[in-house]
Amino acid sequence: MSDKYFVDTNILMYAHDRTAGAKHDRAKALVEELWRDRTGVISTQVLQELAVNLQRKAAKPLDALATRDIVADYLTWQIVVNGGDSILGALELETRYQISFWDALVVHAAQSAGTQVLYSEDLSDGQLYGPVRVINPFSNDVRWGDQSEPTGQNADQLSLSDTPERRKVC
């Protein structure tokens, strides 16, 4: 991977949730690759949703300190800060593509970062939003970073561990 790749919250959640089976394995491998290549992009919205979901929606919710450690690790990624222009842009995308405001805010952040790929399970696999293509990393025939049309808790269960070169998702 050499370009930048935007990652939606659900992919990060699966990467940390050992109870998610095959989705955990795929998400973990993707996130580790993005860390290794330093090509991961997220937004403040994704970080906020991740923090809430780790504490409230995970199979075994984490406490605030464990959640803080995970979120802090992602601060090494490129982060799109959502502001007023982001909200206005998302409202335009919401109308144009008939998607939820929150999904439109993610798409707008991906566009703002100049990414061409948005990894998400929530949006339609293969859908183009201007220059940004959604790729569902859980669809059977996905090759990460492929720009062509895709064909197809407690701290023990939700955690990160450090390695010298990068973070490693458990």
Outline where the language-model segments fall.
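Acidic active-site catalytic centers that drive phospho-/nucleotidyl reactions
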Residues: 8-10, 49, 103, 122
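Short beta-strand segments at enzyme active-site cores
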Residues: 42-44, 119
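Acidic, metal-binding active-site segment of PIN/NYN-like and related structure-specific nucleases
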Residues: 104-146
